[in-house]
Curated annotation (Swiss-Prot):
SUPFAM superfamilies: 1-deoxy-D-xylulose-5-phosphate reductoisomerase, C-terminal domain, Glyceraldehyde-3-phosphate dehydrogenase-like, C-terminal domain, NAD(P)-binding Rossmann-fold domains. Pathway: Isoprenoid biosynthesis; isopentenyl diphosphate biosynthesis via DXP pathway; isopentenyl diphosphate from 1-deoxy-D-xylulose 5-phosphate: step 1/6. NADPH binds at residues 10-13, 36-38, 120, 122, 201. It comes from the Bacteria. This is 1-deoxy-D-xylulose 5-phosphate reductoisomerase. Catalyzes the NADPH-dependent rearrangement and reduction of 1-deoxy-D-xylulose-5-phosphate (DXP) to 2-C-methyl-D-erythritol 4-phosphate (MEP). Its EC number is 1.1.1.267. 1-deoxy-D-xylulose 5-phosphate binds at residues 121, 147-148, 172, 195, 208, 213-214, 217. It is an enzyme of class 1 (oxidoreductase). It comes from Listeria monocytogenes serotype 4a (strain HCC23). It catalyses: 2-C-methyl-D-erythritol 4-phosphate + NADP(+) = 1-deoxy-D-xylulose 5-phosphate + NADPH + H(+).
């Protein structure tokens, strides 16, 4: 039985992870977890899964829960996340928290020798060089939870990675894929949160609509698979059936197909290289799709993706700036402070004023992250 440490238990990925664990109680046990501010859902999870250690964000929530669950050890804040991530009895850390707050817990868990299932893409975006270096030193593999990177991992099984021609990441195009740039000036938060194919959290859904999410995934793929940015291509695949592909030097492609359900990549990360049965509401039949459609990305229509490629190629602290600026800009949009089409402008502004620092250490990354957030907040 694998003992799971789950960060971000009440979020979209966390909820679907718990569904998998619920279906397979003989294979998985939640021994520690974290959640943010959703106390109602958090209480229910603690009652059902009976973790031994829990981290919440606020001190007041920790105090409240300590009185309700005297047999559980509680922590709070970032230090609480770090305590939970390194819980001695845990085998696997599944990091599903949103944002750069997931970086330090991941590094701590690697240092503690935990297996890592990574859904927090910001960890690799902001500090990929540090994370991959630490994982190599500890002989730990980072198993991706993102559907696209899980697809690449599966496509590369048994293959010689030196024979990769390119990685092809697929994208749905998001909520506004058929709107012009001019039409984006009028879109609402409610409209932006209606993703055509996937059920995701709010921030991720907005990132999908701007395609910053795909840009972060490009950087994540660069670090996970050691592929140059020029050899990572993004294509629009409207049906979200082909989750990603690998092209090899002989011209052949290997693709991973499946229903757009995050339980598949989550479970694969937990059972790799094994697979388990997943009960779907509707069986996936390839014959239900008379055609699959592919489109080139229009970088004028999706400037966020171009910004992400630029940040990745510049390297150093520039990806940290892009990520931090985007997090603040998206929060501003969700709070009604920023128009949707201004999200990219805020990120570009932050990048233009920053001179990248090469091969940054952890303290430098954290400092640049905080400085960028503070700057973008002044623009809201």
């Amino acid at each position: 039985m694998k003992k799971i440490i789950l960060l971000g238990a009440t979020g979209s990925i966390g909820t679907q992870t718990l569904a998998i664990i619920r279906e397979n109680p003989e294979k998985f046990q939640v021994v520690a977890l974290s959640f943010g501010r959703n106390m109602e859902r958090g209480r229910a999870i603690i009652k059902e899964f009976k973790p031994k250690m829990v981290a919440v964000w606020h001190t007041r929530d920790r105090v409240t829960l300590e009185a309700e669950f005297p047999n559980v050890k509680f922590f709070n804040g970032l230090e609480g996340l770090r305590e939970v991530a390194t819980y001695l009895d845990g085998d696997v850390l599944l990091n599903a928290v949103m944002g750069s707050v997931g970086l330090l817990p991941t590094l701590d868990a690697i240092e503690a020798g935990k297996a890592i299932a990574i859904a927090n893409k910001e960890t690799l975006v902001t500090a990929g060089h540090l994370v991959m270096r630490a994982a190599k030193e500890k002989n730990i593999s980072l198993l991706p939870v993102d559907s696209e990177h899980s697809a690449i991992l599966q496509a590369l099984n048994g293959e010689n990675t030196e024979r990769i021609e390119k990685i092809v990441l697929t994208a749905s195009g998001g909520s506004f894929r058929d709107k012009t740039r001019e039409q984006l000036s009028l879109v609402t938060v409610k409209e932006a949160l209606k993703h055509p194919n996937w059920n995701m959290g709010n921030k991720l859904t907005i990132d999908s609509a701007t395609m910053f999410n795909k840009g972060l995934e490009v950087m994540e793929a660069h670090w996970l698979f050691g592929v140059d940015y020029d050899d990572i291509e993004v294509v629009i695949q409207r049906e979200s059936i082909i989750h990603s592909m690998v092209q090899f030097v002989d011209g052949s492609f290997i693709a991973q197909l499946g229903t757009p359900d995050m339980r598949m990549p989550i479970q694969y990360a937990l059972t790799y290289p094994d697979r388990l049965y997943i009960p779907y509401e509707k069986e996936f039949r390839i014959t239900d799709f008379s055609a699959l459609h592919f489109e080139k990305v229009d970088y004028e229509r999706f400037p966020a993706l171009k910004l992400a490629y630029n940040a990745g190629k510049i390297g150093g602290t520039m990806p940290t700036v892009l990520n931090a600026a985007n997090e603040i800009a998206v929060a501003g949009f969700l709070n009604g402070q920023v128009a949707f089409y201004n999200i990219e402008a805020l990120v570009e502004n932050a990048m233009n004023r920053h001179t990248s620092i090469s091969d940054p250490d952890l303290d430098t990354i954290l400092q640049v992250d905080q400085e960028t957030r503070a700057y973008v907040k002044t623009l809201l």
